[in-house]
Swiss-Prot record:
GO terms for biological process: box C/D sno(s)RNA 3'-end processing. Keywords: Methylation, Methyltransferase, Nucleus, Ribonucleoprotein, RNA-binding, rRNA processing, S-adenosyl-L-methionine, Transferase. It is found in: Nucleus, Nucleolus. It is an enzyme of class 2 (transferase). Component of box C/D small nucleolar ribonucleoprotein (snoRNP) particles. This is rRNA 2'-O-methyltransferase fibrillarin. Residues 1-12, 20-29 have a biased composition (Basic and acidic residues).
């Protein structure tokens, strides 16, 4: 299993190590040089937007700052006050949303060097621990109109925000339920391509494994964001991560990568793997990487 604790290409997504700025909840203050609640969706000819080299549906803007982006599924609408960038693409205005790694564990995993998040246009994703939908909205952008995000959130308060957001995004299915009991929403979720989990519970790895048994296709992707202190605050973070990896292995999930999420999140790691990957399939994938 590959462990990563630095960005793969050495490029910075924030000059001077400064975070992207946003104006709500989990964010780190206001947007740079913008009043609270403002966005910038004007046509910017100085910004070059290019596809991310590893992740279909994810983009990078090259300008004064390098920013992680997703193409807005609902142009003209922001979800949580995020900055929007519009560029001219062959005579057509295309709008992108800035994806802040300080507000999204999945974005942090990408910036910190993950090689595969198992999501792309057309994917079906089961998202556990959806909260109010900040990261869910970007996954919605990634999978696009042909994909679906099944977003599970237990909190009724966050669930209301999630439902309101999903009204404008038809590819999100909000599920206000406890992820520890997947049988309660088994009639709503089909077989999916990937499970992403950001559930802050001591048994979060077991929760992921249980949902995988219900909903994840054979060979499907598993992305687990782990906060060490939520699992066991009495031992070092690396010990916690190693224990969680072993739990995944015992539940037919083969870890492939472990990515630390610092400096975006302290004592966090993302473990990325495959579910019930057969020996022949693993050999085929290994040979493809060598080629």
């Amino acid at each position: 299993m590959k462990k990563t604790n630095k960005r793969p290409d050495g490029r910075k997504f924030q000059k001077g190590g400064k975070p992207f700025r946003s104006d709500k909840g989990e964010g780190r203050g206001r947007m740079n040089n913008k009043k609270k609640g403002s966005v910038n969706a004007g046509l910017d000819r100085k910004v070059l937007v290019e596809p991310h080299p590893r992740f279909p549906g994810v983009y990078i803007s090259r300008g004064k700052e390098d920013l992680l982006l997703t193409r807005n599924l609902v142009p003209g609408v922001s979800v949580y006050g995020e900055k929007r960038v519009a560029v001219d693409l062959e005579g057509m205005k295309v709008e992108y949303r800035v994806w802040n790694a300080y507000r999204s564990k999945l974005a942090a995993g990408i910036v910190c060097g993950a090689e595969n998040i198992h999501m792309e246009p057309g994917s079906k994703v089961l998202y556990l621990g959806a909260s109010s939908g900040t990261t869910v909205s970007h996954v919605s952008d990634i999978v696009g109109k042909d994909g679906v995000v099944y977003a599970v959130e237990f909190s009724e308060r966050s669930g209301r925000d999630l439902i309101n957001m999903s009204m404008k995004r038809p590819n999100i299915v909000p599920i206000i339920e406890d992820a520890r009991y997947p049988s309660r929403y088994r009639m709503l979720v089909p077989i999916v391509d990937c499970i992403f989990s950001d559930v802050s519970q001591p048994d979060q790895t077991r929760i992921v494994a249980l949902n995988a048994q219900y909903f994840l296709k054979e060979g499907g992707g598993v992305d687990v964001s782990i906060k060490a202190n939520c699992v066991n605050s009495a031992v070092p973070a690396e010990t916690v991560f190693a224990d969680e990896v072993n739990i995944l292995r015992k539940n037919s999930i083969r870890p492939k990568e472990q990515v630390t999420l610092e400096p975006f999140e302290k004592d966090h790691a993302m473990i990325i793997g495959r579910f019930k990957l057969s020996a022949s399939e693993e050999k085929r994938q290994s040979s493809q990487k060598k080629d």
